[in-house]
Amino acid sequence: MTLVSQATPSGRTGASPAFLRKIVVDPWLFGIFAVVTLSVLVFAALPIFTVLKQAVVTDRGFDLAALAEVLTKSFVWESLFNTLLLGATSAVIATLTGFVLAFSATRTTMPGKTFVHGVALLPIISPPFVMALAVVILFGRSGLITRELLGIRNANVYGFHSLVLIQSLAFTPIAYLNIRGMLQSIDSALEDASASLGASRWITFSRVTLPLVTPAILSSALLVFVKSVEDFGNPMLIGGNFNTLAVEAYSQMVGYFDLHSGALLASLMLVPSITAFLVHRYWVAKRSYVTVTGKPTAQTIRISGAAVVLPLSMLCYAIVLAILLFYLTVIYVSFTRLPGIDNTLTTDHYATVFTAGFQTLTNSLLLAGIATPVTAVAGMLIAYLLVRKAFPGSFLLRWGTLLSFAAPGTILGIGYVSTFNAPPLLLTGTAFIVVAAMVVKNLQVGIEAGSNQLRQIDKSIEEASMTLGASNTRTFFQITLPLLKPALFTSLSYAFTRSLTTLSAVIFLVSANWTLITVTILSQVETLKIGVAAAYCSILVFVVLAILALMQLLLSSTSPKR
Amino acid sequence: MSKVIFSNISKRFPGVSGAAAGLAVDRLNLVIEEGTLVTLLGPSGCGKTTTLRMLAGFETPSEGAITIGGRDVTNVPVNARNVGMVFQSYALFPHMTVRENVEYGVRLLNLPRHEMKDRVSSVLATMALETYADRSPSRLSGGQQQRVALARAVVTQPKVLLFDEPLSNLDAQLRERMRDELRAIQLRLGITSLYVTHDQSEAMAISDRVVVMRNGVIEQDDTPLNVYSRPGTGFVAEFMGKANILQGRVEKLDESTVSIRIASTVAFTLPRGNRAFRPGEQVRCVVRPEHIRVDANGAMQAKVRRVVFQGAYVEYLTDLEGQECVFLDSDYYRTGVAEVGQMLRLSVDSQPVWILPHNEAADMGKAA
């Protein structure tokens, strides 16, 4: 500490630039900042740029002809169109269902809200393709509903219609949580004021409530769109001939070893994703009238008229029961010998999972277990560096992490394979590269949660620590990090769930040594071992639920005594 | 030993437009004598908080140097300055108990364990916090939280103690009590202190010197008594409580007194001290409302414009031949309350009347 004061002797200070002083005042923290920023650039920005480069550069250098050639191929345009169509359709439907659920849960006297809430969140904590599996089981050629119940012999479950159904249900929780948060944070006095001015329920809804939640509705639609574009598992399993960019890029890469086309398709995915993301960040977010603090305001007027509540409740229960049906089907099938053909109950599939498949299960848990704390602590640290310390070069960190979040997993996965396949960064086939992908892909949620929380922590609490003689680094670990605990837990839960259930990026990275449960499930489905796949899915959902419950318990037991 | 000197300190905030293009503090010179408490007083945006934060080390001056006890600290980081600070929001660490809060800074000193314990318990005793030592700060009252904040700030035996509007979160009664408590402890410990507030009565009650600031510049640096009764500028006069600044003319001059005419009457005659006046010269007189009273034989005549009943007194806003004049009548129960539109005869207690220096800018240097 005294060293620092000697290093920059007194006197006229105008000469030494302000940003240099920031570094000198806390060299440790700047060191951390430099390492974090460099890591983000290498593991987030570099792979994406590698893919972009591969899309336009061949052996002959910058190759417009090769680019033009790929662009004339019909599968490029078809898959781009398919992706956009699917994304837009799913976004609209998922947002609508999310709104219905959120409105019913916050503004009506619908019975069984806790049940509806719990089930509506299920899809968020399970692998994205559990739904696809369930749909195949229920509506496939030998489907429980199509064949057993309805006797249809040649049902075609594969294609656009199934994808829309699955994605809409799978992404409803995103819209539901988003819109619910905003509905809850609207000051109920606004709706009361409208009523007191003589407005009917409908007028209040359409002129006050709806305009106030419009930003949340738009933002939900954009987020679902991004998720749909990124989704790999569902289109892969159930798309049939309806190929999206993610699937097409994968099959070009892995099926035809066509790196150039694969890179171009993955690059194309960036366009809708980044556009939607930027619109969300710089347009929708700025139009928000309400700050979502997560703190519900006073009780709002509940709509109790049967004419409104009954149809809404029926709709909600239909959605929730559909979700529940899908999950129960998967569990049922995991205990069925040969679904649709031999429906005797058995635990054979679980036996398979715990013997032959045990390795992949422990792999997944181990790698996700490593990635989770790294993601969460790094997220808090980055939030702190960005919100509290504006080091020179902060923008690199900010944009690096945003890019990794907005970029679909496919481009990240392809980028990793292409970037880290030669020294000095020869990482392909290692566990490290899988963990890196998990961390990078899930970092942003922790950063957002951490930043929001930091902005609510009085800055003078940290300043007090400094006046008492603590360095920036010590202040972060002893004062800031403990105060960020809620955000830390949000980030831990999210990172764990996502790391365990991710597919789109890691499918390019797994190796014989390090295979993951999600990849295994996919290959089980492809080889029609539906029962084993269902057993894996059930275990995965159970593990995630158990770990989340454990974390919740830990959080509440370590909360400050009142 | 820990005298604080600001020499020629300026602070520019880049990208801030408006008043003097982001110049928050403009060539400020200030000395805080060892063991004294100096208050920076002024409206928001006057640069007082920036000045305090520069002494703490949160802001770095754009120009100039700051020394504490002869050591140049201009480029020393906050955590190496050995300053204690009491924050407006108290900034108590919410995840620690009262004792842990107080211990935090002492732990960083690497003292022997028993000495650390001794220091903490003696400070807790001084602040009457022993019974609350193991509570969370959120379970304490505002006044108790304030004491914890002070305990935490002084336990490391800082060279300088900084107060950033520490009482503004308390209700009026508690504020006065804590104010006296803060001052008593500061005097007892003899710590050189800088105190920032926008409350003039707080400033007068607590300080050895009051520094009134405006637009990043010191308007006056003086004892509380002088700042109140001999303001250097109209701004200071009006900022330090209510003041009538009446336009007058020098009517009569002799060796020791000067008589001032306000509008049509010679309103008062007061000792001239050693100041120079010219007959007929225009002057501005600071007359505090408490020094004007209703008097049937008074020289001045004023028309009542507004009457505000305050309990202990009645506040009148009157029109004194075209000039606004406010005064307080605490005798109303004897004389009755006048009504709007009524004419009153007033007299001025001439002893405390203060004639503002002619040229504020020229006089400012003298005052400082």
What is the predicted function of each stretch?
Chain A
Residues A195, M466:
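Alpha-helical residues within the helix-turn-helix
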Residues D192, S200, R287-I303, P339-V353:
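Juxtamembrane inter-helical linkers in multi-pass membrane proteins
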Residues F19-R21, D63-L71, L345-F354:
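A short amphipathic helical element positioned immediately N-terminal to and/or at the very start
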Residues E191-D192, E462-E463:
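Short alpha-helical segment that forms part of, or immediately flanks, the ligand-binding pocket
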Residues P173, D192-A193, I203:
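Internal catalytic domains of large membrane-associated glycosyltransferases
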Residues M1-V35, H280-A318, Q552-R562:
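Transmembrane alpha-helical segments of polytopic membrane transport and secretion proteins
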Residues F232-Y256, I341-D342, L503-I530:
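Glycine-rich helix-loop "coupling/hinge" segments at transmembrane-helix boundaries
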Residues V25-R60, T72-Q184, V208, L212-G233, ...:
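Membrane-water interface segments at the C-terminal ends of transmembrane alpha-helices
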